[in-house]
Amino acid sequence: MALAPPITEIEQLKAHPALGRLLEWNTAAVQAVKFDRDELTIWVAKEAICEACLALRDAAECPFNYLCDITCVDWNPSEPRFEVVYHLLSIPHKERVRLKVRLGGDSPAVESVTSVWPSANFYEREVFDLFGVRFAGHPNLKRILMPDDWEGHPLRKDYPVEGYR
């Protein structure tokens, strides 16, 4: 059986609880959407990520009350180079959504969501440690996996295979 093609039109996906809530909250913050293999991905403006997470967490009809993970993708040499990815779950409604924020440049930064989900603390530290993404407002942004004196961020595509010497 062939897979259905991805849906990328916002109008076709407005009925999804996460997208509907974000469009109700701030239409301009939603940059793009993709529904593929029963999973919804929403690209959000980096300036609005904290408020978007808060809007989804506090949504009355379908609260996305659990932050499963935060990770990052390095698309080097493309620009914007980085995407920070937030995986959210609505436990009572068994719905999932993925939020993505595009970040450019050699010193990527985005607002921390630790004020929305305290569990974001270690996820953000891991992304900082391995990719070098800074999270503004993070209560304790320091390395979590690599030694404190480690040079660079080893999951960046421009990181030397043999490490810095």
Enumerate the language-model features and the residues they cover.
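Terminal low-complexity/charged segments
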Residues: 1-165
